[in-house]
Amino acid sequence: MTTFPAKDDFEKSYETGNAQVLWTTMVADLETSVSAYLKLADHEEYSSLLESVEGGAIRGRYTFIGLKPDIIWRCNGNIPEINRKTLGGVRDGDFEIINKPSLESLTDLFAESMID
């Protein structure tokens, strides 16, 4: 399976701290989005599956599978927290409280994570 960017390019960019997405395309006539997700996620706690809406005949349908995040943002009540140390495993003690309203802190994270 060919991935984009290539593994070496991805690793170089990752080491410099640039946000990026690793992706591939595949014909999925024998696989559903959910079955692919279940195989790839393998019960990982912080995994996600996002699908495009139906009716995307012109541009096709898209599935995004997220695995092993490097940042986790969560909110309990109106207290936002962030964990930037997830690659070695997720521990509650690694979450830091963000002293901003929850929506503002999430907006800041979106801006910080922007991929050109």
Short names for language-model regions:
Residues 1-116:
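Signature of the chorismate-utilizing enzyme
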